[in-house]
Each structure stands twice: as structure tokens, then as C-alpha cells.
């Protein structure tokens, strides 16, 4: 690689030192051309560092500092020769003694020239050796900087001092402990995971800093300049070096593109850039493949790379601790406890008896994890053993998987009562799980390009198992009281664990992942000794793992017919119990924001109602009249001491049977009391209370007012202005043209029922808006969140007829956006449609809402009318989505 514009010639020909700025632009252009013509990112990064060395040396001489006894050092990434297009140029000017006034003036001119002439935006420190000693003693960052410093030009006698200073001020142990604590804090800032949706490729676990960490600690002890030198010292293997170098090149290349796209030193792989960078790496989508195929494959490579780096970081630093730090501790005496012919405990961690254990006895691979799963006192795996284990993972082939002894060991791990989740995480991390179940290996690192699934598929799967395990722990029983009780009585927990492992295992293949996963599970279960009935139960759970959540989300579970239909699909309590535990664990493992007490109450209601139907007999028809009478009786029992039965009956006469079928006795009593206390006052009634099903973050709003065309649209517009998210709505019109509306809302700030002033503000805003029958409140203009602008969601509208209710069911799926429900409500109002109920769901960037509507005469739309309205509604949604895209 030859840069065609040598700096000295360039400055001479332009007769102006300020030409360095243009020279930098020219060489950057040449570097980009070299990259596009096939030069490796390592060549480009090194060339850029050398060119900056050349420029700084030129400016150093121009400032007259070449005649001084000072030294100019590159530090940070520049010291490591890791320079990307917009990387900081960090330098240190070092003096053996205090700096003279003359040199201070020259240094000032040199630093100014870096800004004014070269536009380097440098990070600069000026220190004497004594300054370095004082600062390095108390500042880990300074000590780290000194370790990777590199003399660019100046006094060669100073080159030895930076590392000598660190050796004097930090011992191996103090430096190692401090760097490990620093890494732990850094990882915590990134959720201790490699699989964030928008990862920081430099600082997150598995990023560039994790590779730097290995270098810093090794360089401090072994006094080497390159990671490559550690191979000759026996600290890392050739294979590990190859993995690190390939990972480093890949991450540098991503960072290279991030810098050029954002025109700054950017390390975050944001949604803004993921698609474009995927294309630059050659990832494309063939016809028929999912729309996000290319970006998901690129991110899969990233997550797998980050996992490799993270694992090597863990292993190599543990190896350093065990081989260098611990043996040097005062009074250290290694504690060894024999286990069997394959394993022993060394200082509380598992270690092989000899280095050929895994090659001579392959079953020891799974035996190791059996010991970990069933002996909580074991603290982990020794680093040397871990290195052998990672290499042994490659031995797991079909012959290994078909071995009955290995199958028995694997199922013994799954049935462990102690730490199944941690053990499976280790098995995944070290390559065992993905090799033993090859289909699981295919989903490792697989992300779904949306805001709903915030974990990779493999991480989500193991979190699901963690959640299932938590259902048996007392500290989580208060958060999941019903499901914990159900889980405790499951006859075979291994059935739900295997359903969890396989429920998403077919994602990314195309086709129905539930169906394909069920097929994989049956084959696996048969091979592992399950009866045919047990195999079918596991497969049924996988095939139907979305049934319960979709029923609660999209259907009216207060409708006895809905419950009966759902219960008939299950057939018995065994299927209900297994599906309930799997579903709750699944939702909680998908996205922490998805689970709230409102959703918990829906799941609990669906489970309870279905349980009652199954226990009373699936063949029994629903006795609607008996349900109505029972509900009325329970409600009247609550009201009898406050009002006469005649007064109560007078109110109830205005309400239809549907009201008493779908509202609870408690809610009916609440509504009736408010109406009777209000008397003949024409003003709307607005009441707020916590949701009856112990949904602490959900608020019920009851509205009783004269019916009018824009009632729903007006209400949701006001609620949107009040920062309240509607989850459920039920609108019932009484015979005297009064409407009884119940909304369940989630409060974005969580203060609605604890702040009397805010509660009063919400009530007054609703009363005022509902009292002005001819006015419709305008929509709030809110800033669209950045992430939403990068998702191309196809807007869909589906209108069907519910023959029982004689209502149209309008299902919409669109990009979530501020004020969406209010905007949709306005469209219904303009079309003269009455909304009777609504089910609202926000799944990441996607809104999936269902409305039950009729025309003003109470009749459903005809087929032609529904077709026309569907087209109008989709057009409006498309226009709203286009506005969001145009803001990007």
C-alpha cells in the first residue's frame, strides 16, 4: 500500500503548513479506495496510524521540539495503532524533569498546530516522569494509558519509562483487581449482555474493550507489546489468537463504517445504521426471504462474535488469575478435593484429573455440567479445564448424541432441582448446547429486527427457563402467586423445560416456527426416552405456545363463549397448567416492558375462567341466564344497605344482558352506586380507581354520560393528552341514550392514583371534553422516538363479522406512534361508526388493536361498506407511517 502524497512534498508544493489539513483529507480518500479495492481493515488501520505519526512528527519538528529532550508518545487506541477515520488522536508529551518556559511555549505552539493546521482534535497530556508517578499511583486510567504508550518521536531514553512507572506503582494483583472491577462496572452499564438491540461495539460485553482488557493485563505482567507474543509465552493458543484477531478485524470494520456514516467517533450500532452496514458486508435478501433477513444475519454474526470474545475474555483472565495472581498470595495453599476418576475440586472449582479426560472419556463433557447443576457448592470451572472443554465441544457429533449414556446425562441435567438456568447458560456459552442440539446452535445470536423481542432467540429461550425456575422460589411467589402455585404441582417439569428449549428453535428457517419446532421436539423426546403421550404433550405446548397470550390480548375474555372455546382447545387441566406456566414465563422473557400487572391480571383471569369451565365439564352448555342472575344477586348484596332494590332495578332496566355478562358484580355495584348518587345531574360522571384484579399499575376509568357520536374519539384524545395509555375499552349504551364506558389505562408516570391534583386534572379534562358535544379535542403533536423511524411495518386492516354479537371486528396492525389511538378513534367518528369495545396492544414498534363496531343504527357494516372503510383506514395509516419515515 503506497500513499501517493508524501507529507513533506505536499506541504512544500503548497508552500503552506496549513495544507496538512487537505493532505489528511486526500490520504483518507486514498485509504478508503484501498479498502474498497480489497485491502484488509488491519492494513488500513495501521496505515492511518503511521500517517498520523508522520504528520505529528512533522509538526513536532516545525515547532522546534525535535531539538528538545522531550518525548512525544501515542496513547490510547492511537498507542495501539488502532486508528479509525474519526478516532481520537491521544498523545502524551513526556519530560524527564520539569518543563522549561521555553519548551512550554513550543509545546503550546505544537498543540495549537494540531487543532489549527491538522484538525486532529487531539487529547493531550503534558507530564514529567514524577507527574506520571504521582498520577499513575492514584488513577487507573493513567496507569492503563502508560502501559500502551508508544514513542512517536523525541528522546528515545524516555521510551522505557511509562511501563516502568506502572510496574513501580501497581502490583500484578492490584492492577488485575482494579481492571476487573472496572470491567464489571462497564459491563453493568450495558446490561451485562452481548445481545443488546443497539450494542456499543467498543464498550459492551464482547466488544473491543474486552479484547483490550486481555492486552492491558498481559502487557503489564509479561511486558510484551503484541498479543501475538503471548502465544510464545504459552498464555494463549494459536487458535485463540486467530479467534481474537478475526473478531477484532470484524469489529474494526463495523466501527470503520459507523465512523463514515455518522461522520464522528461512533461506537453504537444503532438501528439507524444496521441495515446499511449489513449491506456493506454483503448481506442481501433473496426473493421470498423475510424483509429483515439481511440485517438479522449480519447482527447474528455480530452477536456470535461478541459471545466468542466474551468467552475468551472470561477464560484468559481467569487463567491469569489462577496461574499468576493466586499462587503468589501470602500463605496460599491449594485446596484439592477428589470427586472421581475424571474430576476434582481445586479451590472450589471443577478441574479435570488430566488433560486427556475429554478425549478418552467423551461422556465427561456432559458429566461436568451434571456436577455443576446438582452441586450448588461448586463455584465454577478452572480455566485450564475450561480451555479443554471448549476444544472438546467440537467432538460432539451424531454418534455422541445417539449414545444412551449421553442422553441420560443430558436429561439428568434438565431434571436438576438446583441451578438449571446457570448450567444451560454455561453449556451454551462454551459451545456444548449448540452442538448437542444442532437446531439450537442455529438460533444462537439470532435477533429479530424489532423493538418487541429485545433478546436474541437463544438468550430469550434460556431466560424463559430461568423464569420457570423462579416459579418454585419463595422470593418470586409474591410476584407470581397463581402461576407459582400451578408450577409447583406440575407432575413433570422436564416437559415444560423441553417445551421452552424448542418453542422458538425453528425461528429463522421460514415457515411456521411453532409447527417446525414441535416436529424437532418430538424427534428429540423420542430419542431421550419419553413416552408417546409425553412427546405429544411437549409438541402440543410448542405448537400452541402463543395461544394463551393471543387469546388474552385479542379476545374479550369476559365473554363466556370465548372462554368455552379456549377451554375446549385445551381439553383438560394438565394442558392448561403446562401452557399457563410456559406462557407467563415466555412473556416475561421477551421484553421486561411487556409484562405489567394489567397483563398479569388478564392471564390470571383467563386461567381462572378456563379452569372453572374445565372442572364443571366441557360438554355443559353456557347457561347465560344463570350467569346474569348470579351476577345481579352478588352486586345487589353489595348495594342493599345503601339503596332500595327498586332504585337499583330501575338503573339496571336500562342495561342489556351483555352488560351483566361481561362486567363483574364488583364493577356493576361501583357503576350503579355512582349513577344513583349522581341523580339527575346532566354532567358526565368520571370515576377513577385501581384495577380490580390487583393490577397496581392499571387504572380503571368509569364514564357515564349522554351518548354522542364522537364519544370514544373524544375520550381517547383526552387520555392521550394526559399521558395515559389505553389497554382496554368497553362502551355500553343504555336504552335512554346514556353510555356507560369503562377504560383500563396504564399511567406513563405511575402517579395518577397517588397525586390528587393530577387525578382531579384528568377528571376535569374528561368532564369538560365530554360536555362539549360539538367539539373534538385536537391531537397532541409529539416527537416520534428515534427507533420507530427505522422500521418498515406493513399496515394491515382486517374487518370481519362477529355473527353472535352482530358487530364488525376491525383489526389493525401498524407502526406504533404517539396519538395513534386518538387518530384512529377520529376516523371511526368521521365514518359514523360506534365503538362497543376495544383491545389495545403495543408490541415493541408495532401496534395491534382490535375494535368491535356497528353503524349508528346498531347494525354491522355490509361487506361492501366494510371493504370501502378498510381501504380508507389503511390509506390513513399509510399516510401516518409515511410522515414518520419522512422525519428520518
Curated annotation (Swiss-Prot):
<dbReference type="Pfam" id="PF08335">
    <property type="entry name" value="GlnD_UR_UTase"/>
</dbReference>
<dbReference type="InterPro" id="IPR043519">
    <property type="entry name" value="NT_sf"/>
</dbReference>
<dbReference type="InterPro" id="IPR010043">
    <property type="entry name" value="UTase/UR"/>
</dbReference>
<keyword id="KW-0808">Transferase</keyword>
<keyword id="KW-0511">Multifunctional enzyme</keyword>
<dbReference type="InterPro" id="IPR045865">
    <property type="entry name" value="ACT-like_dom_sf"/>
</dbReference>
<feature type="region of interest" description="Disordered">
    <location>
        <begin position="182"/>
        <end position="204"/>
    </location>
</feature>
<feature type="domain" description="ACT 1">
    <location>
        <begin position="700"/>
        <end position="781"/>
    </location>
</feature>
<dbReference type="GO" id="GO:0008773">
    <property type="term" value="F:[protein-PII] uridylyltransferase activity"/>
</dbReference>
<keyword id="KW-0378">Hydrolase</keyword>
<feature type="region of interest" description="Uridylyltransferase">
    <location>
        <begin position="1"/>
        <end position="338"/>
    </location>
</feature>
<comment type="function">
    <text>Modifies, by uridylylation and deuridylylation, the PII regulatory proteins (GlnB and homologs), in response to the nitrogen status of the cell that GlnD senses through the glutamine level. Under low glutamine levels, catalyzes the conversion of the PII proteins and UTP to PII-UMP and PPi, while under higher glutamine levels, GlnD hydrolyzes PII-UMP to PII and UMP (deuridylylation). Thus, controls uridylylation state and activity of the PII proteins, and plays an important role in the regulation of nitrogen assimilation and metabolism.</text>
</comment>
<feature type="domain" description="HD">
    <location>
        <begin position="457"/>
        <end position="579"/>
    </location>
</feature>
<keyword id="KW-0460">Magnesium</keyword>
<keyword id="KW-0548">Nucleotidyltransferase</keyword>
<dbReference type="InterPro" id="IPR002912">
    <property type="entry name" value="ACT_dom"/>
</dbReference>
<feature type="region of interest" description="Uridylyl-removing">
    <location>
        <begin position="339"/>
        <end position="699"/>
    </location>
</feature>
<dbReference type="Pfam" id="PF01966">
    <property type="entry name" value="HD"/>
</dbReference>
<feature type="domain" description="ACT 2">
    <location>
        <begin position="809"/>
        <end position="887"/>
    </location>
</feature>
<protein>
    <recommendedName>
        <fullName>Bifunctional uridylyltransferase/uridylyl-removing enzyme</fullName>
        <ecNumber>2.7.7.59</ecNumber>
        <ecNumber>3.1.4.-</ecNumber>
    </recommendedName>
</protein>
<dbReference type="InterPro" id="IPR003607">
    <property type="entry name" value="HD/PDEase_dom"/>
</dbReference>
<dbReference type="InterPro" id="IPR013546">
    <property type="entry name" value="PII_UdlTrfase/GS_AdlTrfase"/>
</dbReference>
<dbReference type="GO" id="GO:0008081">
    <property type="term" value="F:phosphoric diester hydrolase activity"/>
</dbReference>
<dbReference type="InterPro" id="IPR002934">
    <property type="entry name" value="Polymerase_NTP_transf_dom"/>
</dbReference>
<dbReference type="GO" id="GO:0006808">
    <property type="term" value="P:regulation of nitrogen utilization"/>
</dbReference>
<dbReference type="Pfam" id="PF01909">
    <property type="entry name" value="NTP_transf_2"/>
</dbReference>
<dbReference type="InterPro" id="IPR006674">
    <property type="entry name" value="HD_domain"/>
</dbReference>
<keyword id="KW-0677">Repeat</keyword>
<comment type="similarity">
    <text>Belongs to the GlnD family.</text>
</comment>
Amino acid at each position: 500500500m503506497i500513499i501517493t502524497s508524501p507529507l513533506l512534498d505536499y506541504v512544500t508544493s503548497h508552500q503552506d503548513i496549513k495544507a496538512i489539513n487537505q493532505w489528511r483529507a486526500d490520504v483518507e480518500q486514498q485509504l478508503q479506495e484501498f479498502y474498497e479495492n480489497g485491502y484488509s481493515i488491519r492494513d488500513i488501520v495501521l496505515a492511518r496510524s503511521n500517517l498520523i505519526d508522520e504528520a505529528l512528527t512533522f509538526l513536532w519538528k516545525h515547532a522546534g521540539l525535535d531539538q528538545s529532550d522531550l518525548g512525544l508518545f501515542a496513547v490510547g487506541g492511537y498507542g495501539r495503532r488502532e486508528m479509525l477515520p474519526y478516532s481520537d488522536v491521544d498523545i502524551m508529551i513526556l519530560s524527564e524533569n520539569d518543563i522549561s518556559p521555553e519548551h512550554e511555549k513550543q509545546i503550546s505552539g505544537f498543540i495549537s498546530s494540531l487543532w489549527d493546521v491538522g484538525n486532529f482534535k487531539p487529547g493531550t497530556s503534558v507530564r514529567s516522569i514524577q507527574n506520571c508517578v504521582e498520577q499513575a499511583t492514584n488513577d487507573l486510567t493513567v496507569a492503563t494509558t502508560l502501559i500502551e504508550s508508544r514513542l512517536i518521536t523525541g528522546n528515545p531514553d524516555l521510551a522505557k519509562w511509562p511501563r516502568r512507572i506502572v510496574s513501580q506503582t501497581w502490583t500484578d494483583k492490584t492492577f488485575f483487581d482494579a481492571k476487573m472491577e472496572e470491567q464489571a462496572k462497564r459491563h453493568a452499564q450495558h446490561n451485562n449482555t452481548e445481545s443488546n438491540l443497539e450494542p456499543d461495539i467498543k464498550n459492551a460485553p464482547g466488544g473491543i474493550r474486552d479484547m483490550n482488557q486481555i492486552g492491558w493485563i498481559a502487557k503489564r505482567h509479561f511486558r510484551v507489546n503484541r498479543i501475538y507474543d503471548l502465544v510464545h509465552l504459552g498464555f494463549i493458543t494459536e487458535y485463540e489468537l486467530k479467534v481474537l484477531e478475526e473478531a477484532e478485524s470484524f469489529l474494526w470494520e463495523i466501527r470503520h463504517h459507523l465512523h463514515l456514516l455518522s461522520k464522528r467517533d461512533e461506537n453504537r450500532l444503532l438501528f439507524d445504521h444496521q441495515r446499511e452496514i449489513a449491506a456493506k458486508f454483503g448481506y442481501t435478501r433473496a426473493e421470498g426471504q423475510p424483509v429483515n433477513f439481511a440485517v438479522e444475519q449480519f447482527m447474528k454474526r455480530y452477536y456470535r462474535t461478541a459471545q466468542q470474545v466474551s468467552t475468551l475474555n472470561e477464560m484468559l483472565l481467569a487463567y491469569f488469575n489462577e496461574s499468576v495472581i493466586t499462587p503468589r498470595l501470602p500463605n496460599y495453599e491449594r485446596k484439592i478435593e477428589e470427586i472421581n476418576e475424571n474430576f476434582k475440586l481445586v479451590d472450589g472449582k471443577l478441574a479435570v484429573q488430566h488433560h486427556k479426560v475429554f478425549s478418552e472419556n467423551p461422556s465427561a463433557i456432559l458429566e461436568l455440567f451434571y456436577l455443576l447443576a446438582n452441586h450448588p457448592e461448586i463455584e465454577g470451572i478452572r480455566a485450564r479445564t475450561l480451555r479443554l472443554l471448549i476444544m472438546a465441544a467440537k467432538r460432539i457429533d451424531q454418534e455422541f448424541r445417539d449414545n444412551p449414556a449421553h442422553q441420560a446425562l443430558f436429561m439428568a441435567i434438565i431434571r436438576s432441582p438446583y441451578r438449571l438456568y446457570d448450567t444451560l447458560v454455561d453449556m451454551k456459552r462454551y459451545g456444548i448446547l449448540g452442538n448437542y442440539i444442532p437446531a439450537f446452535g442455529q438460533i444462537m445470536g439470532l435477533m429479530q429486527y424489532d423493538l418487541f423481542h429485545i433478546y436474541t432467540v437463544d438468550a430469550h429461550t434460556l431466560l424463559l427457563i430461568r423464569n420457570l425456575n423462579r416459579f418454585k422460589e419463595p422470593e418470586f411467589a409474591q410476584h407470581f402467586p397463581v402461576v407459582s402455585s400451578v408450577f409447583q404441582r406440575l407432575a413433570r417439569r422436564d416437559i415444560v423445560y423441553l417445551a421452552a428449549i424448542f418453542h422458538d428453535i425453528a425461528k429463522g428457517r421460514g415457515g411456521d416456527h411453532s409447527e417446525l419446532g414441535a416436529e424437532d421436539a418430538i424427534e428429540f423426546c423420542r430419542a431421550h426416552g419419553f413416552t408417546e403421550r409425553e412427546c405429544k404433550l411437549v409438541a402440543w405446548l410448542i405448537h400452541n405456545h402463543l395461544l394463551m397470550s393471543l387469546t388474552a390480548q385479542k379476545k374479550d375474555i369476559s365473554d363466556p363463549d370465548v372462554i368455552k372455546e379456549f377451554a375446549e382447545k385445551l381439553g383438560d387441566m394438565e394442558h392448561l397448567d403446562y401452557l399457563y406456566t410456559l406462557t407467563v414465563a415466555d412473556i416475561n422473557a421477551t421484553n421486561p416492558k411487556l409484562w405489567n400487572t394489567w397483563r398479569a391480571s388478564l392471564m390470571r383471569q383467563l386461567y381462572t375462567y378456563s379452569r372453572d369451565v374445565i372442572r364443571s365439564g366441557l360438554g355443559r352448555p353456557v347457561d347465560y341466564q344463570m350467569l346474569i342472575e348470579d351476577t345481579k344477586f352478588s352486586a345487589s348484596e353489595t348495594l342493599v344497605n345503601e339503596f332500595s332494590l327498586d332504585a337499583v332495578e330501575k338503573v339496571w332496566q336500562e342495561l342489556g344482558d351483555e352488560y351483566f355478562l361481561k362486567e363483574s358484580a364488583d364493577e356493576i355495584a361501583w357503576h350503579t352506586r355512582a349513577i344513583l348518587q349522581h341523580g339527575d345531574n346532566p354532567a358526565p360522571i368520571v370515576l377513577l380507581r385501581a384495577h380490580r384484579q390487583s393490577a397496581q399499575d392499571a387504572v380503571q376509568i368509569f364514564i357515564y354520560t349522554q351518548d354522542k357520536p364522537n364519544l370514544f374519539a373524544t375520550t381517547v384524545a383526552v387520555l392521550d393528552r394526559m399521558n395515559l395509555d389505553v389497554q382496554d375499552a368497553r362502551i355500553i349504551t343504555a336504552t335512554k341514550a346514556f353510555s356507560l364506558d369503562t377504560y383500563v389505562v396504564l399511567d406513563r408516570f405511575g402517579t395518577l392514583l397517588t397525586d390528587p391534583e393530577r387525578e382531579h386534572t384528568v377528571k376535569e379534562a374528561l368532564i369538560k371534553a365530554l360536555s362539549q358535544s360539538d367539539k373534538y379535542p385536537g391531537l397532541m403533536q409529539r416527537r416520534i422516538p428515534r427507533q420507530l423511524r427505522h422500521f418498515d411495518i406493513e399496515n394491515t386492516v382486517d374487518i370481519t363479522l362477529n355473527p353472535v354479537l352482530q358487530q364488525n371486528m376491525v383489526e389493525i396492525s401498524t407502526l406504533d406512534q404517539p396519538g395513534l389511538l386518538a387518530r384512529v378513534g377520529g376516523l371511526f367518528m368521521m365514518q359514523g361508526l360506534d365503538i362497543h369495545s376495544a383491545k389495545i396492544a403495543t408490541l415493541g414498534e408495532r401496534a395491534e388493536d382490535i375494535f368491535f363496531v356497528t353503524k349508528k343504527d346498531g347494525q354491522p357494516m355490509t361487506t361492501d361498506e366494510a371493504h370501502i372503510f378498510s381501504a380508507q383506514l389503511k390509506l390513513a395509516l399509510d399516510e401516518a407511517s409515511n410522515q414518520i419515515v419522512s422525519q428520518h
